[in-house]
Amino acid sequence: NIVALSEVRDIIGRMTAFVDQVYIPDTLAIASFYKDWFARGEGLGNFMTFGDFPSDGSANPAKRLLPAGVILNRDLSHVEPVDLNDSAQVQEFISHSWYDYSGGKAKGLHPYEGETTFAYDGPKPPYDQLNVDKGYSWLKSPRWRGKPVEVGPLARVLMLYASGHRETKDLADYALKKLDLPIAAMFSTLGRTAARTLET
C-alpha cells in the first residue's frame, strides 16, 4: 500500500542522509588523523568477487552491477575471470577455522559442496591470546586456483574500481585525494574501513 511504501522511502532517505552527512565525513576525518594505518595490515594482495546485483533481473553474469573476477598481486589493470561453477577454480579451506569437513581439514571444498560442521577447539573464554597454529576463526579461507584471496567490501570496491565503474572510481578517487593518498593505500587496514564506507 502507498503508506507503507512512503514509510520505506522515508527510511531510505534518512539512511542516505546519515551516510552522506555523518558516516562518510566521519570516516574521512578519522582517517586523516590515522593515515599511518593506510600502510598497515596489508593482506596478500589477491581479491575475488563472485558478482552480484543483476541489473536487468536475469541470471546473466555479464549483466551484474558487481562483476565476478579476481585481482592478483594488487594489479588493478587486469581482472582474471572466475567461473563459480568450476570446482577446481574456487574452494574454501578450514585449516585454521573452527569447522571440520568430513574429508578432513586439509582439503578445500567448492562452496556448492561446502560443509559447515562446527568444531570449536579454541580456548575457553576468557583468554589472552589465540594459538594461530590451530583454529582461530569462524571464517573459511577462499582460494582461487589454489591462491588465497580476500573477499568482502575491499574486494568488491577494488573490483568495481578495476572494472572502470564510474561512480566507484569517482568516490574512491575523491576520498583518496582528500587524504592525499594513492590507490595503493586501499590495500590496508584503514583501506578496508574506507571500502566499507564507500560501499555503503
Which residues fall in each region the model found?
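Active-site bordering "gate/hinge" segments
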Residues: 1-199
